[in-house]
Amino acid sequence: MIDFEFEFQYAEAKLPSLRQIGGSIPAGRCVVLCGGSGCGKSTLLRCINGLIPQFYEGELKGFCRLNGQDTAGMHIGEIGELAASVFQDPRSQFFTVNSSNEVAFGLENLGLPQETIRQRVEEAFRVFHLERLKDRNVYELSSGERQLISILSAWAMDTDIFLLDEPTANLDFVATRQLKEILLALKRQGKTLLLSEHRLYYLADIADEFWVMADGEIKGEYTATEAKAFSAEQRQTISLRTLDLAEISVPEKEPLPKTAATALAVSDVRYTYGRKAGDTLS
C-alpha cells in the first residue's frame, strides 16, 4: 500500500514541481501516472522512493507511507527494501556485467546466505520463464532484455511495491509485449504497481486506475473502465492517450526527392560486437 502527500520544489527552480499532491494506492493495485513531459510524474516517483531529497535537492514537504511505514528519516536503502524502483534506462542501475550476478547483487548487500541467494536467483528466472537470460553479459542484451533483468533484480528482493518510471521509453513493440507479461505476473502475485507512462495501450488489461497529471497536480483519477470508455475527443481534453492499439496509426511518409544520383554508398564494411561469434554486419 502507498499513501503520500507532497509539495516539492527543486533547488534553483523558480516554480514548484509538485503542488499539494496526494493519493492512496491499496495493496495489489496498479496505478498509472500519465500526462505530458514535465508534469511531475518522475518527480512524484522520486519523492516516494527517496531519491528526493536524498539525491535530488530541493524543498520537500509532506509524508509517504509504504505498507504503513513512514519513510521520513529512512535511508534510501531502507526505502528500497519496501519499494523497488525500475528506471527508463536499466543500464543506469546495473552494478555488474553478468545478468545472474546482477539479480543477486541486492541480496548480497542484505548479507543473505549464499545458498539462499542462489535459490532466489534461480527462482527469479524460473518464475518469469526467462532462463534464456541467465549468465549473460548485460551489455550484449537488448534494451528490452535489460529492462527484464532490472525487474528480476527488484523481484528477487521480495518487495511488495514496484515503482516504474516510463519502463517502455526505450523499448520496441516486441519488448513492450514481453514487459506486459511480466507486469501481469507481478499483478497476479499481488504486487502493488505504480508506473509513469506515455505509452498506455499495453496497460489496458493491467491498470486499475489512470491518474492524469499536469502542472505538478493530479487533475483526474479514472478507473480503467472509465478510461476505456472515453471518446477520442474526451481523451484529448484531459490529455489521456488511447488504450486501444487499433486506434494508433502511423502516417505514411512521402518519398524524399532525389537530389543526387547517390546519397550514400558503402562497401566492404564488417563489424562484430565484442566477443560475439561471426559478423554482426557484413
Feature locations, PLM:
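ABC ATPase C-loop
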Residues: 154-155
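ABC ATPase NBD Q-loop/coupling interface
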Residues: 63-78
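Hydrophobic anchor residue at the start of the ABC signature
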Residues: 151
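H-loop/switch region of ABC-family ATPase nucleotide-binding domains
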Residues: 197-198
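Conserved beta-strand-loop-alpha-helix hinge in the C-terminal portion
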Residues: 217-240
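Catalytic Walker B motif of ABC-type/P-loop ATPase nucleotide-binding domains
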Residues: 162-165
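Conserved ABC ATPase signature
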Residues: 137-141, 145
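Conserved ABC ATPase "signature" region
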Residues: 115-133
